[in-house]
Design a protein with these regions (language model features):
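Generic cytosolic/nucleocytoplasmic N-terminal low-complexity/intrinsically disordered segments
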Residues: 1-2, 33
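C-terminal motif of bacterial Sec signal peptides marking the signal peptidase cleavage site
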Residues: 13-14
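Carbohydrate-active enzymes and regulators
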Residues: 34-343
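Sec-dependent signal peptide recognition
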Residues: 2-9
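Short, low-complexity, disordered segments immediately C-terminal to signal peptides
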Residues: 19-33
Length: 343
């Protein structure tokens, strides 16, 4: 007789912090969910990989541009490449959690929405105002240093950005290009037409910017359909999160905070809206079904926040399983926090 354990690994594509390709995901949870006895001598370990893809809902300015670029650039650097990588290995299975707020924004970008960084990239470098230049210099180095290091011209501009008043129009045009190239997965940079732009390296033209942004649009357009297709074939499972990425137990009842933390300071005015909490679950599933063609049967509660009181809400909507962190499991089982082999 042997024990066969299921190891559940959740990997996060960071919400907004710039990261290199190597740092794009981080193993944050390794929780033994279940043990079962089978007739073998050697132990087996079943590994479940779950990628949690999320961006907060970014606001738009008065001109209708998203104030942050992170949905777009994570789509071009991470979201599409990760699911295509799974597709390259047909025998591999994985789970992707796509939050409703991320899906809404991806759909918006596919329908023509733009962010401020896109807006400042489109402006012809020959007519940039001082305000435009200040934004570009202050924000277009929002990239992991390891990624910047792959582009010699990017390094050159970073090292001289304290003297940007001496920059030429070409310097600004190159920076407009390099920020967006850096936030494109190497897989796509190795393919035409982006391969030629990478080889060029500097002295970019306004036409080059059009080519690059057009490729970004194409990549974004593929993110949702590619996930939907792999889900349809059964190679991946897609889960989602309650609609607005809420801390669901606190919507149900703020007093539930004291269950996980006896010393928690509760608000003076207790808040309890169980129907709102249930609506969050329902609307999240509705949006996922609308955009992906199927209704998920698994869910990742936002921040892994769960309570006994909200579990029934998931079950009522047809959810068969949810995921959370090992700290929740250890408290539920009344055992010490799991320890790691630090060697």
């Amino acid at each position: 007789m042997k024990k066969s354990s299921i190891l559940f690994i959740v990997l996060f594509a960071f919400c907004s912090q710039p990261s290199s390709v190597d740092d794009a995901v981080d193993v944050t949870t390794t929780t033994v969910l279940n043990e079962m006895i089978i007739d073998e001598e050697e132990p087996e370990l079943y590994v479940m990989l779950m990628w949690h893809q999320h961006q907060p809902f970014y606001t738009k300015n008065d001109d209708g541009y998203y104030t942050r670029p992170w949905v777009r650039v994570h789509a071009t650097k991470d979201y599409l490449d990760m699911v295509e990588l799974v597709a390259d290995y047909p025998e591999m299975k994985a789970t992707f959690n796509l939050t409703p707020v991320l899906l809404r924004q991806l759909e918006d970008f596919s329908n023509g929405a733009k962010d401020l960084y896109w807006y400042y990239t489109e402006i012809n470098a020959d007519i940039l105002t001082q305000e435009d230049k200040d934004f570009i210099v202050s924000r277009f180095f929002d990239t992991n240093p390891k990624v910047i290091a792959r582009f010699s011209r990017y390094v050159e501009l970073r090292n001289s950005n304290q003297d940007s008043s001496l920059w030429t129009n070409q310097d600004f045009r190159d920076l407009q290009m390099l920020f967006n190239l850096a936030w494109t997965d190497p897989k796509y940079l190795a393919q035409e037409p982006l391969k030629s732009l990478v080889s060029k390296g500097r002295d970019f033209t306004e036409d080059d910017k059009f080519v690059l942004l057009n490729e970004h649009s194409k990549l974004i357009d593929k993110v949702i359909p590619t996930h939907a297709e792999l889900w349809k074939t059964g190679q991946i499972e897609i889960t989602t999160t309650p609609y607005a990425h809420p801390i669901l137990p606190l919507i149900f009842d703020t007093n539930l905070a004291s269950v996980g933390d006896i010393g928690a300071e509760l608000p003076k005015n207790r808040f309890s809206k169980p129907t709102d909490a249930a609506t969050q679950v329902e609307k999240g599933l509705d949006l996922a079904e609308q955009l992906l063609g199927q209704r998920p049967t698994g869910m990742w509660p936002a921040e892994g926040a769960v309570s006994q009181e909200v579990l029934g809400m998931f079950a009522k909507e047809g959810i068969k399983w949810i995921a959370t962190g090992e700290h929740v499991l250890s408290k539920s089982l009344d055992i010490p926090t799991f320890k790691r082999n630090t060697k």
